[in-house]
Amino acid sequence: MTYAWLWTLLAFVLTWMVFHLIKMKKAATGDLEAEAEARRDGATDVIIVGAGVAGASLAYALAKDGRRVHVIERDLKEPQRFMGELMQAGGRFMLAQLGLEDCLEDIDAQEAKSLAIYKDGKHATLPFPDDKSFPHEPVGRLLRNGRLVQRLRQKAASLSNVQLEEGTVKSLIEEEGVVKGVTYKNSAGEEITAFAPLTVVCDGCYSNLRRSLVDNTEEVLSYMVGYVTKNSRLEDPHSLHLIFSKPLVCVIYQITSDEVRCVAEVPADSIPSISNGEMSTFLKKSMAPQIPETGNLREIFLKGIEEGLPEIKSTATKSMSSRLCDKRGVIVLGDAFNMRHPIIASGMMVALSDICILRNLLKPLPNLSNTKKVSDLVKSFYIIRKPMSATVNTLASIFSQVLVATTDEAREGMRQGCFNYLARGDFKTRGLMTILGGMNPHPLTLVLHLVAITLTSMGHLLSPFPSPRRFWHSLRILAWALQMLGAHLVDEGFKEMLIPTNAAAYRRNYIATTTV
Ligand SMILES: Cc1cc2nc3c(=O)[nH]c(=O)nc-3n(C[C@H](O)[C@H](O)[C@H](O)COP(=O)(O)OP(=O)(O)OC[C@H]3O[C@@H](n4cnc5c(N)ncnc54)[C@H](O)[C@@H]3O)c2cc1C
């Protein structure tokens, strides 16, 4: 009798445990059944990780071709950041190819018609020229990146075969070397698995997933420090103002009808602290005096600082060459795949160009579960993208190195030579501007321009009277230029593209695959 309560308690605990064991087993079986069901049904054709510019555009393009797309994005709120604020004319063309050009409307974007350059009191404005072979108006757009991203997300989500969900992808699910899907945490904190024959990783410049797929590493080159000056309008709001300041460049541009973005680039190893006010002192004392008084550039630069730097932000500039991922069932795109210095503002354009190519390559395939076929197509994608990616990556890398101010006479000669070349305003400048705007992705033409800039720089250093010292420095310019170019010839697989017949074939192939 005394132990009756103990037996009752034991019986209760045992019943509770058996009940829960049965429940857990049922849930596990149910999960597996649901997964198997999803796989059998082929409920999703493509999973896209990340809905930035690349992920959202790709989702729309693939869904338009009838694919069932599941996009998983970590944060569906409007991104507040200062990258991707100039959509080059070439990027607008790619958006039009994808049926997304209207996403540039109703976001108070500003027309970008020219590049204005400033150095040591001299100034030149270089319009993006009208290239007759380019089927689009040669005008880009200056904008708030977050607004564009939201428009792209809305447009993708408006299609019934796109499921856009907030969630953070934790890992890829792999079976025998083939990626089958992802594990992610949804907004309710539940861990979920999703399966599809193809997963596209578009999780941006801080990508974690990339590391398990490709073995390339990113390099931090410098930092861009930026803030917005509110209630302001530049006297020339349609130019991107690039100041050849020291040690690195400043850039000022209109991003909405009454907001101006001010950016200063700072070396990676000496970035002043934002939190203790060092940064505002640096901007006010070191950078502001170098901003030309032309128009109202300096006034707006200072106004932003004096109004208390509401939201000063810094972003790392990175470079990472593209590497082919040899796993099946997965593709990496956007910044997770390939990055370059943002000095020529072309990352979004390259990502969109990649999407146009990939979409056109995948179009004839009714079933993406043929992973061997998809993997072969990805190999040709990697080659076809070269005219655009190699041209833009090389130009960005060389410009970013040339624009660094140093006390080295040869390097300063090249910096001045670059300014002189751009400021001439002749047919050569126009040619380089069409490359810059993404209207002529032609590596061979770029190499010719780079050779011409080198010769201009050498000529500048030798004039008016060549001396042995000047001659020596001009030879150093040549050596430096060859070294920079040489590195890219190898890295970007440029060599074969420089053979004129190959270059022409590459370009034809590129145009055919980017045009709907
Ligand atoms: C300072 C700076 C200035 C730039 N200026 C320009 C410019 O003017 N013009 C231009 O064309 N390019 C510019 N670029 C480059 C451009 O911003 C990028 O190339 C472009 O934004 C890349 O798009 P993306 O979709 O690959 O990445 P993002 O736009 O970064 O999108 C990645 C998305 O993935 C999501 N995500 C990340 N991890 C996960 C996860 N685990 N699960 C789910 N979602 C995830 C993120 O939330 C994000 O929405 C600039 C770059 C820098 C650094």
Curated annotation (Swiss-Prot):
It catalyses: squalene + reduced [NADPH--hemoprotein reductase] + O2 = (S)-2,3-epoxysqualene + oxidized [NADPH--hemoprotein reductase] + H2O + H(+). The chain crosses the membrane at residues 2-22, 43-63, 435-455. Its EC number is 1.14.14.17. The keyword Chloroplast does not apply. Its main location: membrane. FAD binds at V53, A54, E73, R74, R81, R153, V169, D335, M348. It holds the Pfam family SE. Belongs to the squalene monooxygenase family. Catalyzes the stereospecific oxidation of squalene to (S)-2,3-epoxysqualene, and is considered to be a rate-limiting enzyme in steroid biosynthesis. SEQ4 or SEQ5 are unable to complement seq1 mutants. This is Squalene epoxidase 4. It comes from Arabidopsis thaliana. The gene is SQE4.
